[in-house]
């Protein structure tokens, strides 16, 4: 069919010369015009070329100026009309030739189909030539010899055999290619179904409707990580399933948690690796991509939250988040490769004392991120808020704040418990019967949690609230007690840990504690001061004339609290002798000093070391055979 096409050239044919000029003739012309080749150099040729260019430019300018002067508008219009007439003449000539050819064919066909042929004839042809006046006959070709006929049959048979062989080869190649294609497609779809049977979600790619993808990310993550959680499942040449490397993380990453104590790394979390049995399988690659994407989102959210916690001591560097737990201990979080050799630490690790703490923190931040995803899902399923021109702010996830609150709260609770044990150990060594009880995390109440919420979410929600621990302590005098509430809150102001002391001293009802205490030293000073006040009240009540001890021991004197807030008591005997007693209580010891005073010295604050008759007794924590405080008071109270 390609040979039957008719092409009409629109460009004029260029006639070739019948006799092209021979090379000797051209050389002779060059010698006659330019001289011998020996006299030709590059400089002379360049100069000649420049000279010719300048001449041509000058001639063109002169011709242009002359032509512009000679040709006017009328002549230009005449030329345009002439060109138009020539084009019309050529078109008319082509039309006439086409009509002549059509009349010829129509007259020829009028012999057999006159009605159809008459419709395409011109009016002039119908007048001058009757229908069917032109006919055509088939002339039989000259007879061929048997040898020619035999050769023709042989050649045609050879062509047919060759075409049959070529067709057979093409069919075999197509069959083998189809077989390979079926095998590769079968393997591809088997692996796709295996991925689906594992529980992975399969879907079409958004802008590639013919390509399948696997959703390994988390739909409730932030948009930048949610969009990266979809990868294409492509087919290799042999039909193996290939996970598209477009958005899949190339290397595995994990968040490492380290504990630094006194400037030394004392704990490091274990590297988190994928749970796939075969890391090179398609499932192993999907699991690695999911875990790495989760770890990258976790560190991104940690970094994002750390930026708003600079006032609480959280610092960020290029690839690290650091926050303090106490003055001696810090927590470091960074994103590293779990398979690198220097995973444990690039510095020298002195001990592994806090490895359990580091692992617990690593698990906690991952659980908190999953909880944040659950909250995003819960908000997404609720009715949307009213439309507003202001863009809604996406709050930072609570990842660092809960663990910081827990660690700081635990540190302050341990300090307070140690302090109370030391103080009450001193009191018990002095023979004073008193005790205290601690209720850690009294704010966590799982019994009142919302039953519509899963238990895990309810438990996490309890630890996101401000943490509170209560210490209840009994004192020496009846109905005297105090409570210390340790409250830690890092979500809303005021941030940090605060101590609140509730005091019940019947002997000093006007004494109250400050509302909020933020420092250890202040809390320790206030607690020891309250206990010292109760000791002074106990000594005063025991040696008062109404007490049973005073009645049995008539020769003993009574003590009166003159400056109770300074731990000072005064006793006056019948003969007018006066004594002072000073009670000093600290975390490590209880000291009682007695000395004689005269006259107006009873109201003075003299230094005990410079007074006569000074007696001192000290009790420290631990077992002792010395008399107790009340026995010592009874001994020094003898007249």
Curated annotation (Swiss-Prot):
Q: Name one GO molecular function term.
A: transcription coregulator activity
**GO CC annotations on file:** core mediator complex; mediator complex
* Keywords annotated in UniProt: Activator, Coiled coil, Nucleus, Transcription, Transcription regulation
* One GO term (biological process): regulation of transcription by RNA polymerase II
Keyword Nucleus in the entry? The reply is yes
Tell whether Membrane is among the UniProt keywords.
no
- Report the domain of life of the source organism: Eukaryota
Coiled coil location: 160-187
- Tell me the InterPro entries matching this sequence: Mediator_Med17
Q: Where in the cell is it found?
A: Nucleus
What does the record give as the function of this protein? Component of the Mediator complex, a coactivator involved in the regulated transcription of nearly all RNA polymerase II-dependent genes. Mediator functions as a bridge to convey information from gene-specific regulatory proteins to the basal RNA polymerase II transcription machinery. Mediator is recruited to promoters by direct interactions with regulatory proteins and serves as a scaffold for the assembly of a functional preinitiation complex with RNA polymerase II and the general transcription factors.
User: What does the subunit section of this Swiss-Prot or TrEMBL entry state?
Assistant: Component of the Mediator complex.
Write out the similarity annotation: Belongs to the Mediator complex subunit 17 family.
This one is known as Mediator of RNA polymerase II transcription subunit 17
Task: Please give the organism.
Answer: Neosartorya fischeri (strain ATCC 1020 / DSM 3700 / CBS 544.65 / FGSC A1164 / JCM 1740 / NRRL 181 / WB 181)
